[in-house]
Amino acid sequence: MPAVEHVEPSFPRLNGTEEQVTWSMVEYCRSVLLLKCQNLSDGQLKRRATPPSELSLLGLLRHMTKVERYWFQRCFLGSEEGPTYSTTEHPNADFDDLDSIDTDEVVARYVAACDLSRQVARTHRLDEIAVLQRGGEDVSLRYIGVHMIDEYARHLGHADLLREAIDGSVGG
């Protein structure tokens, strides 16, 4: 059974408040990443791009789990949770050693990280400042939302190419 079976696409709002448009775009990006992983086997999710790239759809899910947790839990809330996958010593671990990885667990961790991020977005204003600074500067939740759109946009392009190489599927 595929780790990601059925995903309802979440389309972004075309109008509304800044908050509504920002979070609907982030939500859209999350749903597209899951759509790119939908109905694929473990082997297909672990399939790497053309060398020397280490990218895979499963690696992208692991990476975006880390990104969600870092920006919403660690940076904004100040959570002391340790690294999700990569560490200072092993910065590319999101994409490495996938052969023995349980894909269902990776998907569950991604979904859980997104749920926690949604909770932060629902209960805080865009102009609120994160607990942690970056480069000595305050970080607003607004910045985090925009950064998430940028981060997803970069990796959704990768996901498009990876999925097309697996089974010819395009769009999303």
Could you describe each region identified by the protein language model?
Residues M1-P12, E19-N92, L132-G172:
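Short, contiguous alpha-helical
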Residues N92-V131, R142-M148:
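Acidic/histidine-rich alpha-helical segments that form the ligand environment
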